[in-house]
Every structure is written in C-alpha cells, then in structure tokens.
C-alpha cells in the first residue's frame, strides 16, 4: 500500500488581538456579543465558533421534532421579544437567533469553523493566547485577548453518551444516538425502540409515532414531565389589547418566572404535593387503568433532575392512541431482532435509538495553561459560578438547571460588562478570583450538590468540575431567583477579586 505524506497545516504567524474573545456562537455567545455591544461598545471582540454556522445545540441536533424543553419567553433573551408559541421548534429558535444577529450586525464578529485547541495565559503579557484550528482553510492560527468569555455550552457535540450493552453488534438494524442522527434514516412503517425517557425521548416519540409501525419508550426508571398547553393566555389577551410586543414579552416572562418559582418552591418544601401536581395531568390523559406508578412516578424527588415541558401532552396522547407505548425494565442484551429484557420479555425492533443522554465538556475541553502550568479545573474553586480561582481574566456562562439557560446568559452578560468597566475605572488589566484569608478554611463542596440535582451527565463528570465553597462569593447558587438580586449588586471590591 502506498502512503501519501500529508504536510502539516501551516501556522499563520500574525496573531490577531482583541479586548474580549467569546468562545461559541450559540445562544450564550450571541447573548454575550449583544451585551458587549450594548454596554461596552469601546471593546473590540471576536466570536470563535467551531461549527459551520451559529446556533450551537440548535445547529447540531437534527433528530425529528427537536424543540425547546423550556418556554421561549424565558429561554429567549430579555432584550428580544418572543412572539411565537411558548415551546418552539429548532427551526423557530434558529430563526430567532438569526434575527438577533441580523438586527445587530453580529455576523461580522463571528469566525466559523475555528476550533480552539489550547489557551495559554501569560502574566508577563497580561493576555490569553489561543491556538486555533481552521477547518475552512486547514490552517493553524493564533488569537490573543485580554479577556476570555467562555460561552461554549456544556454538551460534547461530537457524540452522545451511549452505554455498552452485550450483543449490540448482533442487532441487524441501525442503532442511532439522536446526537448523531443520520439524514437518511427511514423509520416509516418500522418498529422502533427508544432507549431512555428524558427530554430527547419525549421529543422524538411524538414526532416519529405517526409514521412508525409502533414506537416503544424503554426506560430503566421513570422521569418527571411537565404537561402544559402550548399557548399563553396572558400573552394572547395582551395582544388582543394591542399591547406592544416588548411589554408582552416582559409581562409574560415575569408571570412565568413567578409561577415557575412557586412550583420550584413547592417541590422543595412539599415534594409529595408537587409530585401529585405533576402526575395529575398524566392520569387525566391516560386514565385510571394505566399503570402510572410503574411508568411515570420516579423514585427521586421533583426537581432533583430537570423536568421537561411536554406541550399539549403530546407524548401521552401518542401513548393513549396506541401509536406509542412505555416499557419500564432493564436491558439484558441486544439480539439480532431487538432487545432481551431482564424480566425475560423481548422487544422486537427494526431500529433502536439510544436516547441515553450526553457527555459534558469542561470549559470546551480546551487545554488551558496558566503561566506555563497546565490547568486542572477540578482543583479550582468557583467565584459565583462564573469565574475560577487562579484563572485570570476569564468568565464562563453556565446556565440554570431548574430554569431556562438563557436567564443566566443575561445576568452574566451584565456582570461581565460591569466588571470590565470597573477594571477600566481602577486602571487595571487583570482580575483573578483569589481566596481571602477568611476563606482558607471553608468547606469545599461539589460544583452541584448531588442530593439537590443529580442527572447522569452531571454525575459522570462531577469529579472533573470546579468545586464551590460554603459561603459567598464562592457558592455556585444555580438559582435564578437568588442571583437576579445578588449579581447586579455584587461587591467587586470585597477582596475576592485580585486586581493587577
């Protein structure tokens, strides 16, 4: 066999420098760019995105029925009114983001097909230098920035999480993870088994059910769901009164946050009552004869895992119609024609879909180095869930688990812009979270308390994530209702941020 030598891509010698470098052009990165333009227009910035276009998750997820599992009044930005149905499809969300980009001319700041492979901080130079691979030109290039704003999200987009089961290689049909959905998959008239019962499964099944011979959701244990109509009465009433869309958006947003906050508090204070509130509409659809206890009453408490909204109860309508069914059991092994369960039952299938979750990335899985020393984020302590001890001039957007992700995009956008302005006022160029003397002996805790929130993707990565302290400002509150009051007035001169 003749092997062809491939010459390594050349490294471009010119290093482009910016005041701020935003990583990712998904909903977080686009939001960050907006806040910079609006609040710190004097700052130069660039957005580096590894994909072919903007959108992040909404670009990479291509499976049938892809939609939000949060309402768009709160998942959308506070500055861009949402005018559609509360739960939106992937295409509607991409269109919404495109409108933001067009309205603010953000396209000129975004560099697509730029994958960051390394980020090195130099205290001598007081800047980050990033090594970047360009897929469009097959070049390796470099950028430098005074401040790094990580908006990469927490999915590993390359592939999803699929456990290994005995006999998978024996199955004659395709085994597909939704995160790697093939465009040519034909499921019309086929028997389909979806392994998993999270938000992805709850989206796939009602979208596919009308075309399949039958579709089965196979789950090891039940999941909580939140059934809601895909309309908003308050929004409809306000629009009938010709209230401006900006007002409609803000009023409905506040009402949803109020209602959702009450439900969350109910779940924390009276979990049994919250459980019944979640199960009642399922019983109303499926009837008293359906085994709700086995298939839809989880072993964990409400809100220990994220709860997906099911618009119009479409998943359960499919079950009631007979197009879909649920099996609660464990997999013994795959067979040539389906799955053998530990109960001894078999599920015949032409296609098996492993909707078994995703793997988290840690700060984009980028190799970080600070003054020549490789950075282990698991050894850092978070400052307010957005910066990290010993890591200069960097902030990360990590959204909420119990509320819409984008609520924190806006809060962190305000905070970072306020911090950048404060640094200008002080005449400094470096800010680093640093433990004060009184913090040295504080108890260190996981990034998220597993007793409070424990989905599989988080449990698999918890040892790789930064830790939090038992006091402010070292807590990762992950609570919108707390942070909307605390972050805007957080003291930037309390000694926890060291300026140079």
Predicted regions and their residues:
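Flavin (primarily FAD) cofactor-binding/catalytic cores of flavoenzymes
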Residues: 2-25, 31-52, 57, 89-191, ...
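Short clusters of hydrophobic/aromatic residues that line enzyme substrate/ligand-binding pockets
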Residues: 68, 77, 165-168, 296, ...
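A short, structural micro-pattern
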Residues: 69-71, 362, 388, 451
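Short coil/turn segments at secondary-structure boundaries
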Residues: 73, 292-299, 470-474
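C-terminal, flexible cofactor-proximal segment of oxidoreductases
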Residues: 201, 224-227, 381-382, 393-500
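Charged, low-complexity surface segments at secondary-structure and domain boundaries
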Residues: 259-269, 300-304, 433-443
């Amino acid at each position: 066999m003749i092997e062809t030598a491939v010459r390594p891509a050349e490294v471009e010698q010119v290093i482009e420098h910016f005041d701020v470098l935003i990583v990712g052009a998904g909903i977080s990165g686009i939001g960050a760019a907006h806040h910079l333009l609006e609040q710190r227009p004097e700052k130069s910035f660039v957005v580096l995105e590894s994909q072919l276009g903007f959108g992040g998750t909404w670009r990479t997820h291509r499976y049938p029925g892809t939609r939000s599992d949060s309402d768009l009044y709160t998942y959308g930005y506070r500055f861009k009114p949402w005018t559609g149905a509360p739960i939106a499809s992937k295409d509607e969300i991409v269109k919404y983001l495109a409108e933001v980009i067009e309205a603010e001319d953000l396209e000129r700041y975004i560099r697509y097909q730029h994958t960051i492979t390394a980020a090195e901080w130099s205290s001598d130079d007081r800047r980050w230098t990033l090594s970047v691979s360009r897929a469009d030109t097959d070049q390796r290039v470099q950028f430098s920035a005074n401040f790094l704003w990580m908006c990469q999200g927490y999915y590993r987009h390359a592939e999803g999480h699929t456990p290994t089961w005995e006999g998978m290689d024996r199955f004659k049909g395709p085994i597909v993870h939704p995160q790697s959905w093939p465009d040519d998959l034909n499921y019309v008239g086929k028997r389909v088994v979806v392994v998993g019962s999270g938000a992805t499964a709850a989206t796939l099944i009602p979208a596919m059910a009308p075309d399949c011979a039958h579709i089965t959701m196979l789950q090891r244990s039940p999941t909580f769901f939140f059934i809601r109509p895909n309309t908003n009465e308050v929004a409809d009433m306000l629009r009938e009164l010709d209230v401006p869309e900006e007002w409609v958006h803000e009023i409905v947003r506040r009402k949803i946050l109020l209602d959702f906050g009450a439900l969350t508090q109910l779940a924390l204070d009276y979990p049994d009552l919250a459980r019944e509130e979640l199960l009642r509409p399922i019983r109303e659809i499926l009837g008293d004869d359906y085994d709700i206890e086995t298939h839809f009453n989880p072993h964990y408490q409400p809100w220990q895992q994220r709860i997906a909204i099911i618009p119009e109860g479409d998943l359960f309508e499919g079950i009631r119609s007979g197009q879909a069914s649920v099996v609660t059991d464990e997999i013994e092994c795959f067979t040539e024609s389906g799955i053998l369960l530990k109960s001894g039952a078999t599920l015949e299938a032409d296609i098996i879909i492993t909707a078994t979750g995703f793997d988290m990335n840690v700060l984009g899985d980028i190799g970080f180095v600070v003054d020549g020393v490789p950075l282990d984020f698991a050894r850092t302590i978070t400052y307010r869930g957005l910066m990290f001890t010993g890591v200069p001039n960097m902030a990360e957007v990590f959204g909420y688990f119990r509320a819409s992700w984008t609520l924190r995009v806006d809060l962190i956008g305000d905070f970072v812009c306020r911090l950048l302005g404060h640094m200008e006022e002080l005449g400094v160029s470096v800010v680093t979270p640093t433990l004060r003397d009184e913090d040295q002996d504080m108890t260190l805790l996981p990034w998220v308390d597993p007793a409070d929130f424990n989905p599989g993707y988080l449990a698999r990565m918890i040892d790789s994530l930064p830790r939090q302290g038992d006091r402010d400002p070292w807590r990762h509150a992950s609570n919108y209702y707390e942070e909307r009051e605390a972050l805007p007035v957080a003291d930037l001169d309390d000694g926890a941020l060291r300026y140079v």
